Structure formats: structure tokens, C-alpha cells
């Protein structure tokens, strides 16, 4: 017994010395021994709910998510009838504008990350007698892309190409937009302020008119709240409440003297100082033998992550006697059509080196580039949802289906029956001068931007007319499609609209009408030519040869005269938007005639711009048809509203103006072209020059290349800069990810006047991808995407990724740069001076990567120098994401 007592005492003693661990939320207790616990009362019971119901209470528990989901007012201002079309009434950066609210700050204190769906609502306090239309616009990650935002907001076409919604006073008093969080940051960093939701803009789409006088104002309110809130990880650091990145950049530019007078004027005017369709995935580890055996990078799409469906319908070949190899219903061949088609060769080197520079113009086949990555099969995976949607936004049908603002006209009570209010050429080449007085810079739509880079077009075009009216306006319009009639100068006589396909719109029941104009032509294809081009003239008639590129006109006429009650305005504004139909297709990709422009869009005096727009859109001259037509029979009547942007990208299109069904037909490609273009991913695989005539003149010097850099658009009226297909389509998107392929052709010249010859010595190609001293020493010498410098020995001999290439054997210097990036997506920013700064790299504006090309030869400025040109195209794992606007354009210099 005595022995047992000693054992028990020893056991109790060990219990007292044992470490006890307990986790209470964010606090972890570790203590030694037993922790006594007691209660204040012998038996604790919960009070009856009947007892608690005697006072105010509710069943729900208020969490942080509940508080953040409560809408708050972020702005209340006046919309005046003096505010012209395109004026920006309000803008706000998120989540900064929410965090500036004391309640939001209190609830978010103590956390590092915030991720949520942003909901913005705009309300107006309008009267039934007022008419006008507002546009709510959104740009993701806008604070980090100020130069892109400037391009977007220069034109109404650019704004309308972004995610937008309209507020029409005659049918409602509020609109709402739900915005998912899409950013290179998985969470908004509440402590550092990194990773933004983006910016919203409230813009005048149609001028406010108030009663007969046409003057007045209404109050608008902007609400915002968060849904699906996810806050992450506790911290004791304070929440960032400073200025957003674009404000910082403005301050820095002012401090350095780089802020221009024009930018200051815009800053003052816009008051920015105040305030289940397509799922396509990249293949992993594509092998040469699979490509040879199956004519596809993948055996049976076994390498693709999940699945592949497409809005572009698989063709029914019908009575085509022989089917070309590229027309196939196999998923592997469909993947090729969408651009997953040009893998880097991973077979034996000797198999293809006799044609090292082959297939530079092709989107498919094989690429011979040396991989600069550690793995010879390096390739990132593309998954759905990285940009907030499962759609493949590089599918051309997605791009073409986006409605863009195109034109506007006025319908007055004085316009009598048969007055022609508006004509428009049926062509996808929707590119026009900025105004009646500024004719050397151009506005554009998504459809026109694509047509600008092709030879042929065919397919339907969608027209939408939005009537800015009140409930006290009435009248009818006749909208006709007249094939192969253009105008009184080119065409003979007056068209008999009683024989045409038409839609009749009753203003009492419709605020907008949308319809599809089918492709009508005697040839399978028409040319992509701007209808106003000078070479379409013949016999002193402008546009006499227009029938080669335009299928006819859409004409809007008065059927029943506009009637306005005495207490409403005597005219209405009609807005026209255009987009591509379900079968709109292009063929023969080529160089664009017009390129993005970032320069001034005004004359010497910017105050003339309002007068220019008034002149462009005015409808003061009556254009009447004197010949009366017989009784009119409408083919289609009713209220056919516009298909919203999101639904249009899912393949939904409005009814046709006639009765036949519009569908895809692959025969025109099979019979006339020999290939089918369905994706921008195909187009950007074509190599193009991005650095030309670069010269090494100092012994020991090397070329330094920033492979991912895209320079800002030209600011001059005579553009001479190089554009690859990648560069051209870069301006349509907010984000990108993936590898880049670079090819260099180098020639030597022994003295002035001697012929050039291909280099016959080896080259050392090195990749620097770490933001450390060596990288900093290289980037500090760069002022463009391609520059030259003498590499210090300490830089080149420290083990960077190196390839030794002999062009006498391989033809070209060809390398592929991996997407070594800090985040899963990269914002599509542009750099004014060509090369990002170290701060740009730290922000994630570009993957940190510089290539150096060093010749194994002696160089002399007078006796032996080297001239090189650089070409690039994205790798097979590359994707653009989040469709945005189209930039203003300028014609390419050809003198």
C-alpha cells in the first residue's frame, strides 16, 4: 500500500508539470500544469426566449460581413442640363472610397486581406417630364493603369466598350452593377494598399433636358457595398488610408515637372483629385511526336486541364466533297483553332534545325526557340475564373459581340413623315474621324478595330437604337435595310423602301430597338476597307466602288411625326450602338492601316471640342424624300431591346431584320481561304518586329531586351513605330499572362558602304530575372525595349540562364522567356520610355526579365559593327483576359 501511494503521488506530480496548450481564436495559451476552472454560480441556465422578447431583439447575428454588406452613400451631386455628352460627372476608386468611411475602417481593423464582390448603385431623383441618359462605367485595376485609363476615356466609343450599364430616365431611376474582384493580388492588402478593385465612372450618355426650356438639373446619388466578403488574417498594423496609386503618380509627375497643361486641364474638368460557354486551357508538356501523329499538340486533349466547349459552332460539312485537314470536330483540332497550336519543340534537336526560322507567320506548327527556363517543358496552366469569368475572352466572337457607341442623331417635332434622319453604311469597318474638324485622328469600335487588321469580311451586323425620351413623347420611325444602295451621288434614283426589309418602332412602347442585318452580297466575301477611302472613288464620284466593301445602308426615316406634350422638350436624342452578329467573320489577317494613338485629340483650343461634336451630330438640315411610297408593311414589329453586353458575349443576339435564320457557315473559309480565324490567340502567334535597326558599335557591348515591354501608343500624327499582332491586340485587354518568344536576326558590316552579311559567329544569350544588383545595373541603362550596353564581367559570369547559339547552324537566334511572375496575372500597362522601372517591376507591372545578346566577336564603330532586328510572339501558354475598350486611332505614316 505504501508503494502504491508513492506511485499515485508521483503521477499527480507529473500532471502538475505537464505543458497544457489551448487555442482561443487568435491567442494560443501554453501553460504548465493543470488550469483550474470554476463558475460564478452552481448551475448556469439560459434565459427563456419569452423573457428576452420583452425588449428589442432580433434573431440574426451581425458579423463583419453583415456590416460591410450594408449600402452606404459615397456621393451625391447634381446632373445639370448644361453638362454635355461625354462629360464625366463622377469617379471613385475602390476600395479606397469605402475605407475612407469610418464604419468600414472600424470593421476592417485588425485584418490583412479583403476580397469581395463590389456592388455599385446609381440613383437619380428625376421627374417624368425630364429626358436624359447616364452611363455607369467600370475599369478594373484602374489605379495601376493611368495611361490605359486615359486612352479608354478619350472617346465615348472607348468608354462604351468597357463594362457599362445605362440609366434611362424614362424607364427607371436607378441602375446597379455587380463587380467581382479581379486583380493580380488575390486579396486587397488593407495594410499596404496594394491591389485595387478598380474605378467606376458616371458619364453623360445623352444630355439632360428639362421641360420646354431644356434647362434644369437633377440630383444623383451613388451607393456602394460589398458582398461575398472574405477578410483574412489578423494583424496589429494600421489600415492604409492614403491616396490610391494613380493619385501618387500624379503627385510625383507634378513634383518632377512632367505633368502637362493638358493633363492639368483634364484633372480639373473631371475632378479626379476629389474624390457557360468557352473554357479553354493550355496543354501541359506537349511532345513533338504527338504533334506529328495527331496533327495536334495533345493526344486527345488529355493534357488539357478540364474541358473545351466553344460558341463557334462545329460545322456541318454537308456536300463538301473533300474536307480540308483543318476542318475537324475533334476536340484536339478545335484547340488548334483557338490558338493552342504552336508548342516549343521538345524532340531531338537534329530533327528540325535545318529550318530554324520556319513558321514565323503561322499560328500553328512548331517553334524552335530555346527555353530560357530551368525546365525544358516549362509552361503555365490556364484555368477559368482568373479574370472573373469562364469565357475565353480571346474568342473573336466575344470581342465582336460587344456593343459600342457609334453615332447619334436628333429627332425633332418639325421632322415630317419620310424625313431621312440617319443613314449608315453596312460594314464592320466602323472607324471614323474624331469630329468634323479633326479628320486625322479616329474613333473606333471593337468591330472596326478587328476589321482594321483583316482583308475580308462576311456576316451580320447588329444595330441598336436608344431613344432618350419621356413618357409624353409619341411617334413612329421606319428603320430599313437597303442592300446596295448608298446615296444619291453613287446610286441611281430614290430607293423604294416599301420593298425593303424594315422594322417599325413605336416610341410610346419602346425606349430602344435592336436587330441584326444579315450578310447580303453576290460574293462570299467583301473587302475590309473604310467606306470613305479615297481609292473607292471613280468618275469624280466619291465612293463609287463602295459595293466591293459595303453591302448597303441602314436608313432611319420618320413614319409618324414626333409629338411632344407641351411640358416636355420638343426633340429627342437617338443613340446608335453597333456590334458583330453571330456569323460575323474575317479572313486574311494583315497589318493594320490605323494604329492606337495617345496624343492630343483637340485643336489648338480645347474649348472648341463641344462645338465640333455639335457640328458632327447635329441634324438641323431637313433631308426629305419627295417621292411618296405605297402602304408600308413592317416585317418585324415590337419591342426588341438590346442584348446586354454579358449576354451578347454568351452568344445571344437580337432578331434579324428579315425572316431567315442566321447561322455559321464554314464553306467560305473552305472554298476561298483555306483557314478559319476564330481566336485572337491564333493571330498573336504570328511574329512581328518590335525592335529594328539596333546597332552594336563598341567592343564588348551587348543588346539588352525587355521581352514583355509594350510601349505607349504614338503621340504624333505620323506613326512609324513597329507593331506586332501581339502589340495591336494588347490594347483591348486589362490583363495577360504567359511566356514570350524572341527571335533575333543579326548582320555585320565592315565599314560604311560595304554590304551587310549574316553573322558567322556564336552568340551568348542570357536571362536576368531577379530584382537584385545585376538586374538593377542593366535596367538603369535602358531607355527602350531594346538597347545596348557593355556588360560588366561580374554580371555575366555569375550563372544566369544562358544559351549559346550559332546562327550559321540554326539560322536565327531564337529563345522563349518563361512567365516567372510574382502573381497569376499581369496588368496590361504600357511604358512611355520602353523599359519598366524597378518600381514598375515591384508593383507587378511586368515579370522581371531582361535578355542580353552578346556576340563572340570584336566590334568597331568604323570597321566592324553589328545591326540586329528583334521579333516576338507569345508562347503557347499565353492568354489575354478582361476585355476593355478600343483606343483612339491614327493613320500609319506612309510618306
Swiss-Prot record:
Instruction: Fetch the InterPro entries from UniProt.
Output: Dicistrovirus_capsid-polyPr_C, Picornavirus_capsid, Rhv-like, Viral_coat, VP4_dicistrovir
Which modifications occur after translation, per UniProt? Specific enzymatic cleavages in vivo yield mature proteins.
The feature of type site (Cleavage) is located at 283-284, 340-341, 635-636
- Molecular function terms, GO-annotated: structural molecule activity
Does this entry carry the keyword Ion transport? no
The alphabetical list of record keywords is: Capsid protein, Host cytoplasm, Virion
Does this entry carry the keyword Glycoprotein? no
What SUPFAM superfamilies does the entry give?
Answer: Positive stranded ssRNA viruses
Relate the protein's function as given in its record: Capsid protein 1, together with capsid proteins 2 and 3, form an icosahedral capsid protecting the viral RNA genome. The icosahedral capsid has a pseudo-T=3 symmetry with a diameter of approximately 300 Angstroms, and is composed of 60 copies of each CP1, CP2, and CP3. CP1 is situated at the 12 fivefold axes, whereas CP2 and CP3 are located at the quasi-sixfold axes. All these proteins contain a beta-sheet structure called beta-barrel jelly roll. Capsid protein 4 is a tstructural component of the icosahedral capsid protecting the genomic RNA. It may play an important role in capsid assembly.
What's the protein called, per UniProt? Structural polyprotein
Amino acid at each position: 500500500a505504501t508503494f502504491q501511494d508513492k506511485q499515485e503521488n508521483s503521477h499527480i506530480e507529473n500532471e502538475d508539470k505537464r505543458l497544457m496548450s489551448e487555442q482561443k481564436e487568435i491567442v494560443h495559451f501554453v501553460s504548465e500544469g493543470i488550469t483550474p476552472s470554476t463558475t460564478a454560480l452552481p448551475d448556469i441556465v439560459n434565459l427563456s426566449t419569452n423573457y428576452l422578447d420583452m425588449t428589442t431583439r432580433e434573431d440574426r447575428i451581425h458579423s463583419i460581413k453583415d456590416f460591410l454588406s450594408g449600402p452606404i452613400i459615397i456621393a451625391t451631386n447634381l446632373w445639370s442640363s448644361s453638362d454635355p455628352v461625354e462629360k464625366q460627372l463622377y469617379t471613385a476608386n475602390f476600395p479606397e472610397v469605402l475605407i475612407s468611411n469610418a464604419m468600414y475602417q472600424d470593421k476592417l481593423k485588425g485584418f490583412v486581406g479583403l476580397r469581395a464582390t463590389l456592388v455599385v448603385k446609381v440613383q437619380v431623383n428625376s421627374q417624368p417630364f425630364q429626358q436624359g441618359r447616364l452611363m455607369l462605367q467600370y475599369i478594373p485595376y484602374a489605379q495601376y493603369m493611368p495611361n490605359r485609363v486615359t486612352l479608354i476615356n478619350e472617346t465615348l466609343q472607348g468608354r462604351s466598350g468597357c463594362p457599362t450599364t445605362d440609366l434611362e430616365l424614362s424607364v427607371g431611376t436607378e441602375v446597379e452593377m455587380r463587380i467581382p474582384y479581379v486583380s493580380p493580388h488575390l486579396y486587397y492588402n488593407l495594410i499596404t494598399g496594394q491591389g485595387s478593385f478598380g474605378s467606376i465612372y458616371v458619364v453623360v450618355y445623352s444630355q439632360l433636358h428639362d421641360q420646354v426650356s431644356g434647362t434644369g438639373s437633377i440630383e444623383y446619388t451613388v451607393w456602394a457595398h460589398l458582398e461575398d466578403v472574405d477578410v483574412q488574417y489578423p494583424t496589429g498594423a494600421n489600415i492604409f488610408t492614403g491616396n490610391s496609386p494613380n493619385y501618387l503618380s500624379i503627385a510625383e509627375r507634378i513634383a518632377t515637372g512632367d505633368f502637362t497643361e493638358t493633363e492639368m486641364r483634364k484633372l480639373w474638368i473631371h475632378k479626379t483629385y476629389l474624390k457557360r460557354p468557352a473554357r479553354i486551357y493550355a496543354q501541359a508538356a506537349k511532345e513533338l511526336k504527338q504533334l506529328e501523329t495527331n496533327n495536334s499538340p495533345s493526344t486527345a486533349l488529355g493534357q488539357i486541364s478540364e474541358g473545351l466547349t466553344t460558341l463557334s459552332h462545329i460545322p456541318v460539312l454537308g456536300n463538301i466533297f473533300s474536307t480540308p485537314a483543318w476542318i475537324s470536330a475533334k476536340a484536339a483540332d478545335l484547340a488548334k483553332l483557338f490558338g493552342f497550336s504552336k508548342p516549343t519543340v521538345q524532340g531531338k534537336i537534329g530533327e528540325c534545325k535545318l529550318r530554324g526560322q520556319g513558321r514565323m507567320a503561322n499560328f500553328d506548327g512548331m517553334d524552335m526557340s530555346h527555353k530560357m527556363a530551368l525546365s525544358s517543358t516549362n509552361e503555365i496552366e490556364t484555368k477559368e475564373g482568373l479574370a472573373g469569368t469562364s469565357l475565353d475572352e480571346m474568342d473573336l466572337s466575344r470581342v465582336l459581340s460587344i456593343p459600342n457607341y457609334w453615332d447619334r442623331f436628333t429627332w425633332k417635332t418639325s421632322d415630317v413623315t419620310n424625313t431621312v434622319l440617319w443613314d449608315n453604311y453596312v460594314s464592320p469597318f466602323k472607324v471614323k474621324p474624331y469630329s468634323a474638324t479633326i479628320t486625322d485622328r479616329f474613333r473606333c469600335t471593337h468591330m472596326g478595330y478587328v476589321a482594321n487588321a483583316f482583308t475580308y469580311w462576311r456576316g451580320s451586323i447588329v444595330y441598336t437604337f436608344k431613344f432618350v425620351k419621356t413618357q409624353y413623347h409619341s411617334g413612329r420611325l421606319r428603320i430599313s435595310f437597303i442592300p446596295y444602295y448608298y446615296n444619291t451621288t453613287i446610286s441611281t434614283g430614290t430607293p423604294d423602301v416599301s420593298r425593303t426589309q424594315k422594322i417599325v418602332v413605336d416610341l410610346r412602347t419602346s425606349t430602344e430597338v435592336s436587330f441584326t442585318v444579315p450578310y447580303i452580297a453576290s460574293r462570299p466575301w467583301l473587302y475590309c476597307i473604310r467606306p470613305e477611302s479615297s481609292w473607292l472613288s471613280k468618275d469624280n464620284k466619291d465612293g463609287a466602288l463602295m459595293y466591293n466593301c459595303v453591302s448597303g445602308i441602314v436608313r432611319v426615316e420618320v413614319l409618324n411625326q414626333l409629338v411632344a406634350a407641351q411640358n416636355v422638350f420638343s426633340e429627342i436624342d437617338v443613340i446608335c450602338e453597333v456590334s458583330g452578329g453571330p456569323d460575323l467573320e474575317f479572313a486574311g489577317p494583315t497589318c493594320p492601316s490605323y494604329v492606337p494613338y495617345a496624343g492630343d485629340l483637340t485643336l489648338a483650343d480645347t474649348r472648341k471640342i463641344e462645338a465640333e461634336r455639335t457640328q458632327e451630330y447635329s441634324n438641323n438640315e431637313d433631308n426629305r424624300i419627295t417621292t411618296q411610297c405605297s402602304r408600308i408593311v413592317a416585317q418585324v414589329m415590337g419591342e426588341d431591346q438590346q442584348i446586354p453586353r454579358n449576354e451578347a458575349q454568351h452568344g445571344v443576339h437580337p432578331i434579324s431584320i428579315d425572316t431567315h435564320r442566321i447561322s455559321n457557315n464554314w464553306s467560305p473559309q473552305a472554298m476561298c481561304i483555306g483557314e478559319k480565324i476564330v481566336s485572337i490567340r491564333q493571330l498573336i502567334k504570328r511574329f512581328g518586329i518590335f525592335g529594328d535597326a539596333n546597332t552594336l558599335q563598341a567592343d564588348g557591348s551587348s543588346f539588352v531586351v525587355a521581352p514583355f515591354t509594350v510601349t505607349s501608343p504614338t503621340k504624333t500624327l505620323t506613326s512609324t513605330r513597329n507593331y506586332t499582332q501581339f502589340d495591336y491586340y494588347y490594347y483591348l485587354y486589362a490583363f495577360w499572362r504567359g511566356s514570350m518568344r524572341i527571335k533575333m536576326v543579326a548582320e555585320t558590316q565592315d565599314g560604311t558602304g560595304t554590304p551587310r552579311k549574316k553573322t558567322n559567329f556564336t552568340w551568348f544569350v542570357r536571362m536576368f530575372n531577379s530584382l537584385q544588383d545585376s538586374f538593377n545595373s542593366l535596367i538603369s541603362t535602358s531607355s527602350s525595349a531594346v538597347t545596348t550596353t557593355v556588360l560588366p564581367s561580374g554580371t555575366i559570369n555569375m550563372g544566369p540562364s544562358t544559351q549559346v547559339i550559332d546562327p550559321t547552324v540554326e539560322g536565327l537566334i531564337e529563345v522563349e522567356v518563361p512567365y516567372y511572375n510574382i502573381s497569376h496575372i499581369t496588368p496590361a500597362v504600357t511604358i512611355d520610355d520602353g523599359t519598366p522601372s524597378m518600381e514598375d517591376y515591384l508593383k507587378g507591372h511586368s515579370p522581371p526579365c531582361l535578355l542580353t545578346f552578346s556576340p563572340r566577336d570584336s566590334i568597331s564603330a568604323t570597321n566592324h559593327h553589328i545591326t540586329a532586328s528583334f521579333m516576338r510572339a507569345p508562347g503557347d501558354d499565353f492568354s489575354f483576359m478582361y476585355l476593355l475598350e478600343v483606343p483612339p486611332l491614327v493613320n500609319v505614316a506612309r510618306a
